[in-house]
């Protein structure tokens, strides 16, 4: 579960894979960019990738997008492969009727967890309860 939470930050506002986001779904994943090796060393050729799953809260689908020798000047996984992942995942979630994430509940729970953590920092001796928070 902790790894899934970390992978979800990749598609967050500051993440390298934010282009992989799918509207109304939490997405988690990892971008990848690698240079191709040749007999003479590393060439100016690349492989861009994005591997991810959705919904991150209850994974139903996983996909990996690999772009061999991307053209157009961009070669980073977050810029080349992540948008393709988003398009494919959005269509697959729709076709399989996977319900969107309940964002209202998600944000309420996140707020409760943060409030509990802050309260425990201030007074660690007091029992703090936040219903529904681990």
Where in the sequence are the language-model features?
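Short, gly/Ser/Thr-rich active-site loops of penicillin-recognizing serine hydrolases
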Residues: 82-134
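Active-site beta-strand/loop architecture of penicillin-binding DD-peptidases
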Residues: 4-97
